[in-house]
Swiss-Prot record:
Keywords: Golgi apparatus, Membrane, Phosphoprotein, Sugar transport, Transmembrane, Transmembrane helix, Transport. InterPro entries: Sugar_P_trans_dom, TPT_transporter. The modification Phosphoserine is found at residue 50. Pfam families: TPT. This is UDP-sugar transporter UST74c.
Amino acid sequence: MSMSRGGNTTLDLQPLLAESDVGNRELEEKMGGSADRSSLLDGSGSKELSHREREDSALFVKKIGSALFYGLSSFMITVVNKTVLTSYHFPSFLFLSLGQLTASIVVLGMGKRLKLVNFPPLQRNTFAKIFPLPLIFLGNMMFGLGGTKTLSLPMFAALRRFSILMTMLLELKILGLRPSNAVQVSVYAMIGGALLAASDDLSFNMRGYIYVMITNALTASNGVYVKKKLDTSEIGKYGLMYYNSLFMFLPALALNYVTGNLDQALNFEQWNDSVFVVQFLLSCVMGFILSYSTILCTQFNSALTTTIVGCLKNICVTYLGMFIGGDYVFSWLNCIGINISVLASLLYTYVTFRRKRAPDKQDHLPSTRGENV
């Protein structure tokens, strides 16, 4: 503001206008900066969302791929084992389990030397870290082969579904995971179908039933404990496979020797048959592949899912089993029960593997003894 010589009072607005222009420019810069930051935040948020979606898609593919790999491996070894033990009348399922242990040790040992796989070296506390998996692993293998030898494949497949219920209960108790209502309904339907099929088993074999039920309990324990060890131990899936086989080799060899199975197997007259030898070696190698696929499937899925996928492959095994081995006796009630169990397996597969937009949520429960499914 200034006074003119003529005595008139006038206002000099130029400084005020200049200050206003500066303020407007500062405000525009702030607004522009805020908009830029907002766009940057929106861009980074969309990138994070896109990255998360890619990770979810990759995990989904791994879940499906590992489940299919396990199902195919389980199907192949069931058919090959049945051919060796029943069609060729190989006398010792214990010796066959020893061959499968040997194949796992040799393949993984060579793989580590060639740096194809990696796992920690043997230490004094290695056995304690993976216990009780070696015992479960050996028992599951031996009793599973025993059940395969003594029962027809359709009945073996039906009775194996009891392992699903056992796995579900163990997951609740040990891992604190409660299955959804749809999962529970499908599991109970599978068990009901298996019971219906077993009620009219015309080729009943008590020893085979005992073998399979022991295998069911061990399969459930194996799946749950593998999941637990993979989450809490640095040994990894290759280490679990290798040390399970390594620690149980000598006990399995001693058991073969004491029971006379070693002599029976070595004196088997079909060793000159090249087709049988190929089948036997394939059974040994498939034992290793099955162990790997089981751990891989359990790593990317739940132990219950791994168990159900193993039973889903029995859709093919059930019908092929009517012709493989020649020891299946057909009845309508048995067939209806088997198909109910198969349909329930398909229901569980749909419930478990359907793709969801939101991440799967599991209820973690306190490990109390009073909880029931």
